């Protein structure tokens, strides 16, 4: 009898486990408790929170996704793994861009060669777009546009030109592609034209120095604008000017930000400011720079604020309380478009978890929290985190 009773309990346990496993897909997502960091004291109306993509060091497969819920004041780490336990290798190797379009969240996973598409409210996997060595993503009229190095990762003086790929956001199918300059980076869209900054970073020391202009109707390159070597980021202000950052060559030519008039597609000047990362919010460009020099074998770090309406430098350091002394490697910067709170990430040594800092609009530290490895890319959402 005792043996039969034990056997019955074991059998019941096995059947119960099988039942739970069979129903796993129907179970609701249970979010982590999160870490209390503080609610938004300025009370944003529409924005509910912010996603943060942690790049992860190349080759480590440690790209992760975090979420700051400004309605509860809680920070949730590594939510993709939590909400997608069946996805092999989770997010992949080196997250390079993060954007929201409609009800979808798009994470560009550079060295894994795909764009991960998620539900913007739950961060649950919806689909994947395969693009070799993908870099940045932007959107217009139901289409996504992805810049691609179009070849393997690595320095190569004979690296092939890159491309821009068009994707239908309804079915995530690639519809068109066009060849541009070498190692294309960030893009902006204006008046039916897409502008992409070409770096030529793999072709050192023979960098590219152009912006390719694509007609979105024909999807052909209609113009090439000569700007400066090793271009990277691009932002568009409300006055019809584009701001393009150049990394320089890390020797005699320093980093700078160049201004292009959208009416004439000509370079009209430069800001004389180094910029590794840029965020345009209203009439202000926030720029962080970690400018490495092989001559001095050291970094020069700056936190600049520039007024695009008045065309003048506001400050060489938008952090006003001395907190910059805590930050080893400023790696990402963004500004809440409603509250104007400033967010800066610290990559530390690139191989350990970094930190996210929140500053008041006046540049005073509100809080900081540990993030993933190399925290870098942001996306604000008006949707409630489920």
Q: Model-predicted segments: where are they?
A:
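Intrinsic disorder/low-complexity signature
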Residues: 1-2, 234
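Bacterial N-terminal signal peptides that target proteins for export
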Residues: 2-11
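C-terminal motif of bacterial Sec signal peptides marking the signal peptidase cleavage site
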Residues: 19-22
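Predominantly soluble domains enriched in secretory-pathway, periplasmic, or organellar proteins
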Residues: 24-386
């Amino acid at each position: 009898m005792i043996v039969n009773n034990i056997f019955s309990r074991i059998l019941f346990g096995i059947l119960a486990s099988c039942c739970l496993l069979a129903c796993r897909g129907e179970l609701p997502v249970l979010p982590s408790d999160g870490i209390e960091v503080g609610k938004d004291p300025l009370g944003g109306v529409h924005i509910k929170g912010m996603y943060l993509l942690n790049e992860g060091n190349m080759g480590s497969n440690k790209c992760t996704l975090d979420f700051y819920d400004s309605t509860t004041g809680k920070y949730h780490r590594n939510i993709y793994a939590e909400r997608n336990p069946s996805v092999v290798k989770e997010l992949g190797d080196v997250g390079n861009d993060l954007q929201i379009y409609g009800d979808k969240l798009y994470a560009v996973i550079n060295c894994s060669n795909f764009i991960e598409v998620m539900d913007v409210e739950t961060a649950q996997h919806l689909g994947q777009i395969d693009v070799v060595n993908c870099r940045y993503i932007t959107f217009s009229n139901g289409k996504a546009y992805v810049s691609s190095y179009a070849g393997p990762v690595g320095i190569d003086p004979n690296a092939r030109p890159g491309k821009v790929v068009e994707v239908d956001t309804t079915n995530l199918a690639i519809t068109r592609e066009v060849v541009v300059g070498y190692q294309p980076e960030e893009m902006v869209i204006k008046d039916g034209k897409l502008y992409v900054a070409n770096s030529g970073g793999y072709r050192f020391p023979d960098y590219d120095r152009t912006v390719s202009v694509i007609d979105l109707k024909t999807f052909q390159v209609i113009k090439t604008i000569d700007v400066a070597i090793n271009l990277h980021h691009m932002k568009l202000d409300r006055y019809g000017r584009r701001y393009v950052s150049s990394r320089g060559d890390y020797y005699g030519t320093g980093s700078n930000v160049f201004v292009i008039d959208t009416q004439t597609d000509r370079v009209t000047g430069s800001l004389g400011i180094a910029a590794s990362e840029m965020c345009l919010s209203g009439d202000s460009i926030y720029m962080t720079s970690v400018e490495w020099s092989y001559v001095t074998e050291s970094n020069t770090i700056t936190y600049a604020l520039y007024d695009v309406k008045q065309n003048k430098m506001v400050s060489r350091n938008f952090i006003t309380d001395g907190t910059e002394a805590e930050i080893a490697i400023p790696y990402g910067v963004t500004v809440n478009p409603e509250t104007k709170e400033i967010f800066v990430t610290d990559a530390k040594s690139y191989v350990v978890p970094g930190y996210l800092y929140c500053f008041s609009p006046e540049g005073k530290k509100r809080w900081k929290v540990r993030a993933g490895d190399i925290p870098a890319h942001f996306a604000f959402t008006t949707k409630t985190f489920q």
